[in-house]
Amino acid sequence: MIKLKNLERRYPLGKEKFFYVLRDINLEIAEGEFVSVMGPSGAGKSTLLHILGMHDHGWEGEYSLNDTAVHHLKPKERATLRNEQIGFVFQQYHLLDDLTVYENLEIPLSYRRYSKSERAAMVADTLDRFQIVGKKDLYPRQLSGGQQQLVGVARAIIAEPKLLLADEPTGNLHSGQGEEIMELFRKLNDEGVTIVQVTHSEKNASYGKRVIQLRDGWVVNK
């Protein structure tokens, strides 16, 4: 599903000098895998995730997603591919404060060619699946941290993405809420969703099937 070849991310420091965030990354992630990316702070974990999610375009090398050569695509084409195939879950929830839960869930569907009635049906199904029907007219500020992250996960998967990317998804939650989110990830993976998560937690990593360790921008295991 994901293939990275000789991928690097660097920033200029001066004349012919660079700071490398990622170095010579060669990776393959198969469809249906649940992979955890781990390593110390500054290892390049979040940068790798943002490259996979096509939010960072300043890298060099080759990146293929489902046999599409991302490195050959223009930014607009990458955005289309991202909206069609990738869902995101962030540590800071990233819900839009001025929109209700219902409206937040509807956002990813606006990038697809769904009719109004189809969007309404998909939102209703998702509200029911995540047991948040009673929260649909509330705003993010009216929800607990766990509830906000639950809505964040629901929004990430409502359009049935092939790939789910999660950056420290339980970082702002207490242990019980974190376990609820990770059990949900396990269930989604069992249903066939490919998941790549960045985490510092060995416990969260244990929910996946493989760990990729980064150190100083290098992959030190696969």
Residue ranges and their predicted role:
Residues 99-107:
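Short coil-to-helix segment of the ABC ATPase nucleotide-binding domain corresponding to the Q-loop/switch region
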Residues 158-162:
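A short, proline-enriched helix->beta-strand linker immediately N-terminal to the Walker B motif
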Residues 61-69:
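Conserved ABC transporter NBD signature motif
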Residues 53:
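Helix-to-loop junction immediately C-terminal to a conserved catalytic motif
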Residues 164-167:
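Catalytic Walker B motif of ABC-type/P-loop ATPase nucleotide-binding domains
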Residues 38-40:
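The feature captures the beta-strand-to-loop junction immediately N-terminal to the Walker
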Residues 139-143, 147-149:
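Conserved ABC ATPase signature
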